[in-house]
């Protein structure tokens, strides 16, 4: 640690954190920042960049840790983003590329802030949607809120730019022979960002270059752990040409059960409801912060839950606006399942629910945060991937880790209610191989974040490396 010559006190190593404004991206990076601040202690000074309307996501962290401060920059306007919108949660799924492109306009303000700062950051840790931050004149660490295998696939897509043989066939299989286990997916199951790419369009060329900058960044931090994805972490090191890849997961909240937004049911009520149920007898249903089921899917899922006879908690994201193709749960459902079903409209205290002894299975869209939280809880996953990296996550969960069972797949698929009912009933009875594997993986996950565990060692290694960057300036 350097010493300030004026007061003879050690100079802290300054690190800038830049989350991407979407719940599934902000939450894990802010949780990582919390751990970084606690573990780094007096060695680190941390600044977190947010736009004004995203400050509430950061506020709990600012009140919990003293060596973190905010950098609030105005949101850069974009012609296709409504005025006042600064987070992807207020946009349809198609809003991701708009947000990526808009945030690229923070390059000049960031350069100005860095060059004028009396003690500028020696490094930046930014979300993998913000690859352009590699070009700020300081070492940039790519933070992946997704699985290591997803990083492998995204790198291959944006560097090699594979295309379909038959442009009209979305069922065509895309192979990744250079990646361990040679994964393959239908073309409609790979990144929608990649599938939407338009050659020569300036906005899309910016996004392509940004993803390519991830591979060329100084280092990579992944929300995973060696026992779960070691083979993919080693592949990333070979691909990037160095060992500056740190697996610091599972990144889980140190506190807070209701960080994501308003909910129709209090956390205390949810916990009391679960307390009255037997161990491993409740199915938890949640599709994350972005997915709104179609009316037909909602009806099929409600029917499957009703027919199954299982106890369940269903966290429902309802449409922001009236939409004839997307429906709410029909009136009367709550009454028909009263006593064995609890419907939460809005944000659910997912971490607390999954960790409760009564929860035995989790119907999930396979967003990586949800997968990680289920792994830490040791809960059997029932997979229903719909988009983005969810197909990759589902394949990892079911085919490789064997801690899940397929329930359905696809954003528009309407499942058979009777088949869903069978899957639900089977998931909370007996000791399936998948349930046993889930318990074993939970132990490996918890071991990784214990003192001298693989992820704690990687976190310490990351901190030491960042501090060394400050010493060498």
Curated annotation (Swiss-Prot):
It is an enzyme of class 2 (transferase). It catalyses: a flavonol + UDP-alpha-D-glucose = a flavonol 3-O-beta-D-glucoside + UDP + H(+); a 7-O-hydroxy-flavonol + UDP-alpha-D-glucose = a flavonol 7-O-beta-D-glucoside + UDP + H(+). An anthocyanidin binds at residues 25, 388. UDP-alpha-D-glucose binds at residues 348, 350, 365, 368-370, 373, 389-390. InterPro entries: UDP_glucos_trans. It holds the Pfam family UDPGT. GO terms for molecular function: flavonol 3-O-glucosyltransferase activity; flavonol 7-O-beta-glucosyltransferase activity; quercetin 3-O-glucosyltransferase activity; quercetin 4'-O-glucosyltransferase activity; quercetin 7-O-glucosyltransferase activity; UDP-glucosyltransferase activity. Its EC number is 2.4.1.91, 2.4.1.237. SUPFAM superfamilies: UDP-Glycosyltransferase/glycogen phosphorylase. Coiled coil: none annotated. Keywords: Glycosyltransferase, Transferase. The active site is at 25 (proton acceptor), 127 (charge relay). Possesses quercetin 3-O-glucosyltransferase, 7-O-glucosyltransferase and 4'-O-glucosyltransferase activities in vitro. Also active in vitro on benzoates and benzoate derivatives. Belongs to the UDP-glycosyltransferase family. This is Flavonol 3-O-glucosyltransferase UGT89B1. It comes from Arabidopsis thaliana (Mouse-ear cress). The lineage of its organism: Eukaryota, Viridiplantae, Streptophyta, Embryophyta, Tracheophyta. The gene is UGT89B1.
């Amino acid at each position: 640690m350097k010493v300030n010559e004026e007061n003879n006190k050690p100079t802290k190593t300054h690190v800038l954190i830049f989350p991407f404004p979407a719940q599934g991206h902000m939450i894990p990076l802010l949780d990582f920042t919390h751990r970084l601040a606690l573990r780094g202690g007096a060695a680190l000074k941390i600044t977190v960049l947010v736009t004004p309307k995203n400050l509430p996501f950061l506020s709990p962290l600012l009140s919990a840790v003293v060596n973190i401060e905010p950098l609030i920059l105005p949101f850069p306007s974009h012609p296709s983003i409504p005025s006042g919108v600064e987070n992807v949660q207020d946009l349809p799924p198609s809003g991701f590329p708009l947000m990526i492109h808009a945030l690229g306009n923070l390059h000049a303000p960031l350069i100005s802030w860095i060059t004028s700062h009396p003690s500028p950051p020696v490094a930046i840790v930014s979300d993998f949607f913000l690859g352009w931050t590699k070009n700020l004149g300081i070492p940039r660490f790519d933070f992946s809120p997704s699985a290591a295998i997803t990083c492998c696939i995204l790198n291959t897509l944006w560097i090699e730019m594979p295309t379909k043989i038959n442009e009209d066939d979305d069922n065509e299989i895309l192979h990744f022979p250079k990646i361990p286990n040679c994964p393959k997916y239908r073309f409609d199951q790979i990144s929608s960002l990649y599938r939407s790419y338009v050659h020569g369009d300036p906005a899309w060329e910016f996004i392509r270059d940004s993803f390519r900058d991830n591979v060329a960044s100084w280092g990579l931090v992944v929300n995973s752990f060696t026992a779960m994805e070691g083979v993919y972490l080693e592949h990333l090191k070979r691909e990037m040409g160095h060992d500056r890849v740190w697996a610091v997961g599972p990144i889980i909240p140190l506190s807070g059960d209701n960080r994501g937004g308003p909910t129709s049911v209090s956390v205390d009520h949810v916990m009391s409801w679960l307390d009255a149920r037997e161990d491993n007898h409740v199915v938890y249903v949640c599709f994350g912060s972005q997915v709104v089921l179609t009316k037909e899917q909602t009806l099929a899922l409600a029917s499957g839950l009703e027919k199954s006879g299982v106890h369940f908690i269903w966290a429902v994201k309802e449409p922001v606006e009236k939409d004839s193709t997307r429906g709410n749960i029909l009136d009367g459902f709550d009454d028909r399942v009263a006593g064995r079903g609890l419907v939460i409209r809005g944000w659910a205290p997912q971490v607390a629910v999954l960790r409760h002894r009564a929860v035995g299975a989790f119907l999930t869209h396979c967003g990586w945060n949800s997968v990680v939280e289920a792994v830490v809880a040791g809960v059997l996953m029932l997979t229903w991937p719909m988009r983005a990296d969810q197909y990759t996550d589902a394949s990892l969960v079911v085919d490789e880790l064997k801690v899940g069972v397929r329930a359905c797949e696809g954003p528009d698929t309407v499942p058979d209610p009777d088949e869903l009912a069978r899957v639900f009933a089977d998931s909370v009875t007996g000791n399936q191989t998948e349930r046993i594997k889930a318990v074993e993986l939970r132990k490996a996950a918890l071991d990784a974040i214990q003192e001298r565990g693989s992820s704690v060692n990687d976190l310490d290694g990351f901190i030491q490396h960042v501090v060394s960057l400050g010493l060498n300036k």
